Amino acid sequence: MCRDTIAEILTSIRNAYMDRKRVVRIASTNITENIVKILFREGFIENVRKHREKNKSFLILNLQWNRKRLHKNLFSFKLKRISRPSLRIYSNSQRIPRIFGGMGIVILSTSRGIMTDREARLHGMGGEILCCIW
């Protein structure tokens, strides 16, 4: 059985937002750490900690709250998995999609590592489109 770790972390973050949880615990791998770093850098996640328990590493994510409203709703955003193990989607640097005219981000896996669509266009690189966030 093939485990899709990217889909698992996106689903756990999405479910935590829908259930109005503040903290999410996900399994730590190189891919998940790089995706979480991008989410943290782009402001979708408030804080990240690495936790070790019985020879297993976990990432503990504090989700971003919308502090501008009086009734403190969670900061809402959408996560969508694009390329999956059964159907890989690749794009060159000219054909990387723009989400809402640049308001959202696309996370790609390139030969230089996992990066956002803006970084990939800046370096002139394409790759596998992992997911979209808006």
From Swiss-Prot:
GO biological process terms on file: translation
Compartments where found: Plastid, Chloroplast
Keywords for this protein: Chloroplast, Plastid, Ribonucleoprotein, Ribosomal protein, RNA-binding, rRNA-binding
GO cellular component: a single term: ribosome
InterPro entries: Ribosomal_uS8 (IPR000630), Ribosomal_uS8_CS (IPR047863), Ribosomal_uS8_sf (IPR035987)
Biological source species: Jasminum nudiflorum
Family: Belongs to the universal ribosomal protein uS8 family.
Functional note: One of the primary rRNA binding proteins, it binds directly to 16S rRNA central domain where it helps coordinate assembly of the platform of the 30S subunit.
Domain of life (superkingdom): Eukaryota
Signal peptide residue numbers: none
Keyword presence, Cell inner membrane: no
A Pfam family that the UniProt record links to this protein: Ribosomal_S8
GO terms, molecular function: rRNA binding; structural constituent of ribosome
NCBIfam families, sorted: PRK00136.1
Cited Gene3D superfamilies: 3.30.1370.30, 3.30.1490.10
Protein known as: Small ribosomal subunit protein uS8c
Main localization (coarse): plastid
Subunit structure: Part of the 30S ribosomal subunit.
